[in-house]
Amino acid sequence: MYVVYAIRLDDYVGRSLSPSQALLKVGVSVHDVWYRLDANERFEGKNSYRALFKKIEVLGQKKFDTKDQAEAYEKMVLAGLGKKDLSIAETVKGVTELRVETPGRLETLQALGLLEG
């Protein structure tokens, strides 16, 4: 099983920027988003999401049977969110596209079925 997830990253403590708004990260993982966050922390250490952001909130995740299905859905979601807004100085595996959270982007996640609640 694969999932496409959306997480909110807030209170960045890295070295390249001080965003006043939360950031959105959309990605693909095996199992679930928690597996991805745990693996990221285990392998990335000081450059993990949990080390670089004080607040991490799972906004939603959607299950797929195959990696191809998940990647196609992720591509559609990323296109719907528009171009990435920024990059951080630290190299974090899997973090190539961050976007500033906006009401419009949250509406897009909701419309595409990726925002829980």
Predicted regions and their residues:
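Non-catalytic accessory segments flanking enzymatic or RNA/DNA-binding domains
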Residues: 1-117
